[in-house]
């Protein structure tokens, strides 16, 4: 198992967490442990890292990479369940939380996982291969209207209606089973002049992956739960990879910083809702030119940080 995954915005993310050597930190997306290994280097033996991942292969790879550290707790679970995970571990408060929302290099580069539009494989795209619906179920089971909705909303694809219609037409003849079968359907309906700026299947694959893994639905809850468990001055750092995720994080941080619901004309707040965090990054931190050139998967990444009041 080759779980090589180059962490994006590594230095910026570690700096953003303001790591205390005796603190407790949660990596909600452990992956290949690129970020976690750097966190551990800054922790004393009294410090603790809790690493969560819903991909069992990520957990196995991280255990191997971090085998020299005894202050790591590994949790095979979805970070949606962050609150119950911390409760089960009898952890009342933590000093920092990291979420890296990108698909790992391992997942993209392992054809049988079905994430990549560059390699042929059965349609799958499940982060946790042990449960949930797969990309095959979405492509072959959703109505045309539902396919249109997710490709439009989650992929921001201008040809979403044409793609949805073409998928339904194709599957009426026979099921769409593989990634490259789906790629061909997409390519056939997108005009050639619109196939120049990036792979034509990228947005549709993103949309289906988000649907399969409920990626956007779980973000708001996880951020809110995470902030509740932060110590004062503790930080939550979130790396996003597309505008939908970034918008959700930006909006949620703003809501937590200014939760007041009083009408603007009220001279003072009477709703009683107090700020929970201070937003550290008014504009997201993005990779520098060197990282963009040397790690193509970093190019769309953005880091946003908030600090518990």
Swiss-Prot record:
It is found in: Cytoplasm. Its EC number is 2.1.1.199. Residues 290-309 are annotated as: Disordered. It comes from the Bacteria. S-adenosyl-L-methionine binds at residues 33-35, 53, 79, 100, 107. Disulfide bonds: none annotated. One of its GO terms (molecular function) is rRNA (cytosine-N4-)-methyltransferase activity. The keyword Ribosomal protein does not apply. Keywords: Cytoplasm, Methyltransferase, rRNA processing, S-adenosyl-L-methionine, Transferase. GO terms for cellular component: cytoplasm. Its main location: cytoplasm. It catalyses: cytidine(1402) in 16S rRNA + S-adenosyl-L-methionine = N(4)-methylcytidine(1402) in 16S rRNA + S-adenosyl-L-homocysteine + H(+). One of its GO terms (biological process) is rRNA base methylation. Residues 299-309 have a biased composition (Basic residues). It is an enzyme of class 2 (transferase). NCBIfam families: 16S rRNA (cytosine(1402)-N(4))-methyltransferase RsmH. Specifically methylates the N4 position of cytidine in position 1402 (C1402) of 16S rRNA. Belongs to the methyltransferase superfamily. RsmH family. This is Ribosomal RNA small subunit methyltransferase H. It comes from Clostridium novyi (strain NT).
């Amino acid at each position: 198992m080759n779980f090589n995954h180059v962490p994006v915005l590594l230095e910026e993310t570690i700096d953003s967490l303001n790591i205390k050597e005796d603190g407790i930190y949660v990596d909600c997306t452990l992956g290949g442990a690129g970020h976690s290994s750097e966190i551990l280097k800054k922790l004393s033996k009294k410090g603790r890292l809790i690493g969560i991942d819903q991909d069992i292969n990520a957990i196995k790879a991280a255990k191997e990479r971090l085998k020299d550290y005894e202050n790591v707790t590994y949790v095979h679970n979805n970070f949606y369940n962050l609150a119950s995970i911390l409760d089960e571990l009898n952890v009342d408060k933590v000093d920092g939380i990291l979420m890296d929302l990108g698909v790992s290099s391992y997942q993209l580069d392992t054809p049988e996982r079905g994430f990549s539009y560059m390699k042929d494989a059965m349609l799958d795209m499940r982060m946790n291969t042990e449960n949930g619906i797969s990309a095959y179920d979405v492509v072959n089971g959703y109505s045309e209207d539902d396919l249109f909705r997710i490709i439009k909303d989650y992929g921001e694809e201008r040809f979403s209606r044409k793609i949805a219609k073409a998928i339904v037409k194709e599957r009426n003849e026979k099921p769409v089973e593989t990634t490259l079968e789906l790629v061909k359907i997409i390519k056939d309906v997108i005009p050639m002049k619109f196939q120049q700026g990036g792979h034509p299947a990228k947005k549709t694959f993103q949309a289906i992956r988000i649907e399969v893994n409920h990626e956007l639905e779980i973000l708001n809850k996880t951020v809110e739960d995470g902030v509740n468990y932060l110590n004062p001055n503790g930080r939550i750092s979130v790396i996003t990879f597309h505008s939908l995720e970034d918008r959700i994080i930006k909006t949620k941080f703003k809501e937590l910083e200014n939760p007041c619901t009083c009408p603007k004309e009220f001279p003072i707040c009477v709703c009683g809702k107090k700020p929970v965090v201070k937003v550290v990054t008014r504009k997201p931190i993005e990779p520098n030119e060197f990282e963009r050139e040397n790690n193509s998967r970093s190019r769309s990444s953005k880091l946003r940080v908030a600090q518990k009041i």
